[in-house]
């Protein structure tokens, strides 16, 4: 694919849009870490490492100095990635998606290794050969005609690490916004506020284009603090202590509100597979690929590597120097699906568990429910009757967190009537909804939790059927007209959160009443619009999904054990 064109910034913009659900405000966290570094870091050691990184040749003691300082920085920061190796199996992703991911990781591995060891040059790292051996090898390559005399590496500089254990270099490079900002303020003699203002403008420019050295020079006239940023072209494996343009741009991306900047993505084990699935979808739409050409990573390669390095934390901006292994080591693709769990024996008087979830899926649901705060306002709504619900939504407006899932109905005739006059869900769109989700969610809800609802009868019956008489419901009792004041605005803002209400909904023809809305009723949208009626506005903040998308539906050929 070396002849294909990388539309770098267009890809970046597409990734920003596609992965916007996992971007979050990080400015406060970054500045808190910045202040911690300013007060606790020895900048004499920082200056020493910066001098070392400017040298063409480095040895074991230099690597030890870099690793020690990285460990000190990591201990002062709260934004750090933790070692969470991920194991992806059929079920969390389809077999085709797993094969695509595995292939891309292998291609990326080959590219990175070729980039670090460019043929015929000293490269960034050349195994555990000594400097003398490297020099002698270069002479031999010239003698047999493979390498031209006087040839050096890319950018005209040979960077050599003369170390025995190359694994100690892994994850010791790369910039962190908190470190970049603290170095600019402390070593540049600038106030923290001036640095933040300058980098914010650089970040705003980054929403429209990749800032280059000419842009940096122009912005430096307005913000003199930016003059400490190096005017050199980007290189492979430069230290996070070097004030490069790319490091400054990354810091700027974290200081602006909005923009869906990739740098602000945060993942954890419950959202990892969903993020990967979405990434592959964006890749397909934009025809992204892993290039075979050695050198800097393109936007898709970059985010793929960062996501797969660790399943928990901020892939772009956190301290990751304590992570062991690389992306292809820490994200393992397994093509053999786990055997289904044997059904639990039914005791006398007990109700059978229909469509039980596998332990790992049940654990993800439990973690999702634990993401709710028991003491906050919590809306709940269902579509379908309480004895045969087809959709459940639970929404907390203060945190914008929500649980949302579907269920295949048992009574198909009744379902089709409700679809025509109410929710607009088509049977084919919930045919493969994973059984057991609604029951599992209700089972793990905190004891005596209070819910807010528009109409309590159906919700109470649903809770009672699951033996949860301890759960309490507050009925707001809005009129039909009141409840839908914000309907159009809510659908306009958040329709991307729900794509299962595709059917045509027919207006009501009851005598003496106005025709009902022709918009389909969605449990999640209803929760958001009911809350908007009570507070008087629709929040701009993006709702945050607590259940991974990939567990909501199963593969069509999956057998359900009853």
Swiss-Prot record:
Enzyme Commission code(s) on record: 3.1.13.-
Region (Binding site for the cap structure m7GTP): 53-238
Any one cellular-component term (Gene Ontology): helical viral capsid
EC class name: hydrolase
Subcellular location: Virion; Host cytoplasm
Residue sites binding Mn(2+) per the record: 381, 383, 526
Pfam families: Arena_ncap_C, Arena_nucleocap
Positions that bind Zn(2+): 391, 498, 501, 522
GO-annotated molecular function: hydrolase activity; metal ion binding; RNA binding
Top-level taxon of the source organism: Viruses
InterPro entries reported for this sequence: Nucleocapsid_arenaviridae (IPR000229), Nucleocapsid_C_arenaviridae (IPR035084), Nucleocapsid_C_sf (IPR038115), Nucleocapsid_N_arenaviridae (IPR035083), RNaseH-like_sf (IPR012337)
Keywords from the UniProt entry: Capsid protein, Helical capsid protein, Host cytoplasm, Host-virus interaction, Hydrolase, Inhibition of host IKBKE by virus, Inhibition of host innate immune response by virus, Inhibition of host RLR pathway by virus, Interferon antiviral system evasion, Manganese, Metal-binding, Ribonucleoprotein, RNA-binding, Viral immunoevasion, Viral nucleoprotein, Virion, Zinc
UniProt site positions, description: Important for exonuclease activity: 458
GO biological process per UniProt: negative stranded viral RNA replication; RNA-templated viral transcription; symbiont-mediated suppression of host cytoplasmic pattern recognition receptor signaling pathway via inhibition of IKBKE activity
Described function: Encapsidates the genome, protecting it from nucleases. The encapsidated genomic RNA is termed the nucleocapsid (NC). Serves as template for viral transcription and replication. The increased presence of protein N in host cell does not seem to trigger the switch from transcription to replication as observed in other negative strain RNA viruses.
Cited HAMAP family: ARENA_NCAP
Comment, domains: The N-terminal region is important for the cap-binding activity while the C-terminal region contains the 3'-5' exoribonuclease activity. A CCHE zinc binding site is present in the C-terminal region and may thus contribute to the substrate binding and/or the specificity of the exonuclease activity.
Homology family: Belongs to the arenaviridae nucleocapsid protein family.
Record's subunit section: Homomultimerizes to form the nucleocapsid. Binds to viral genomic RNA. Interacts with glycoprotein G2. Interacts with protein Z; this interaction probably directs the encapsidated genome to budding sites. Interacts with protein L; this interaction does not interfere with Z-L interaction. Interacts with host IKBKE (via Protein kinase domain); the interaction inhibits IKBKE kinase activity.
Protein name (record): Nucleoprotein
Record organism: Bear Canyon mammarenavirus (isolate Mouse/United States/AV A0070039/2000) (BCNV)
Gene responsible for this protein: N
């Amino acid at each position: 694919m070396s002849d294909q064109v990388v539309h770098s910034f267009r890809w970046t913009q597409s990734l920003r849009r596609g992965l916007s659900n996992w971007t979050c405000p990080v400015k406060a966290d970054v500045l808190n870490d910045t202040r911690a570094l300013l007060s606790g870091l020895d900048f004499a050691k920082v200056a020493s490492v910066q001098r070392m990184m400017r040298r063409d040749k480095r040895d074991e003691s230099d690597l030890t100095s870099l690793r020690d300082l990285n460990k000190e920085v990591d201990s002062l920061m709260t934004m750090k990635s933790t070692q969470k190796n991920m194991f992806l199996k059929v079920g969390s992703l389809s077999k085709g998606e797993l094969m695509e991911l595995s292939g891309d990781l292998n291609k990326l591995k080959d590219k990175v290794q070729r980039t670090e060891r460019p043929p015929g040059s000293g490269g960034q790292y050349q195994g555990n050969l000594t400097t003398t051996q490297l020099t002698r090898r270069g002479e031999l390559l010239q003698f047999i005609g493979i390498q031209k005399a006087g040839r050096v590496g890319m950018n005209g500089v040979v960077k050599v690490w003369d170390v025995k254990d190359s694994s100690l270099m892994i994850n010791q490079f790369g910039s962190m916004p908190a470190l970049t900002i603290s170095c600019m303020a402390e070593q540049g003699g600038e106030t923290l506020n001036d640095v933040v203002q300058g980098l914010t403008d650089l970040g705003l420019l980054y929403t429209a284009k990749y800032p280059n050295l000419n842009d940096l020079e122009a912005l430096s006239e307005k913000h003199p603090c930016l003059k400490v940023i190096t005017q050199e072209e980007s290189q492979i494996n430069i230290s996070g202590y070097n004030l490069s343009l790319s490091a400054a741009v990354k810091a700027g991306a974290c200081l602006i509100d909005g923009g869906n900047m990739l740098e602000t993505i945060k993942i954890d084990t419950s959202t990892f597979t969903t993020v990967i699935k979405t990434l592959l979808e964006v890749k397909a739409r934009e025809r992204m690929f892993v290039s075979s050409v050695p050198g800097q990573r393109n936007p898709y390669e970059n985010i793929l590597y960062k996501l797969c390095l660790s399943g928990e934390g901020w892939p772009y901006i956190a301290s990751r120097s304590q992570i062991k292994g690389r992306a292809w080591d820490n994200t393992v693709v397994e093509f053999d699906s786990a055997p289904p769990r044997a059904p639990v024996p039914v005791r006398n008087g007990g109700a059978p568990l229909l469509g039980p979830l596998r332990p790992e899926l049940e654990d993800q649901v439990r973690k999702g429910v634990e993401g709710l705060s028991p003491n906050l306002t919590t809306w709940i709504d269902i579509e379908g009757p309480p004895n045969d619900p087809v959709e459940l939504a639970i929404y907390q407006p203060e945190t914008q967190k929500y649980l949302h899932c579907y269920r295949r109905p048992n009574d198909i005739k009744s379902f089709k009537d409700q679809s025509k006059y109410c929710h607009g869900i088509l049977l084919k769109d919930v045919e493969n909804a994973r059984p057991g989700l609604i029951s599992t969610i209700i089972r793990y809800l905190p004891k005596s939790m209070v819910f807010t609802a528009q109409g309590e009868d159906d919700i109470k019956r649903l809770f009672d059927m699951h033996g949860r008489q301890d759960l309490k419901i507050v009925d707001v009792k809005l009129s039909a007209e009141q409840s839908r004041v914000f309907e159009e605005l809510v659908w306009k803002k958040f329709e991307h959160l729900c794509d299962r209400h595709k059917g045509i909904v027919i207006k009501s023809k009851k005598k003496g009443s106005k025709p009902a809305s022709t918009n389909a009723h969605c449990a999640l949208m209803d929760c958001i619009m009911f809350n908007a009626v009570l507070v008087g506005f629709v929040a701009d903040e993006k709702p945050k999904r607590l259940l991974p998308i990939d567990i909501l539906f199963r593969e069509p050929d999956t057998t359900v054990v009853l």
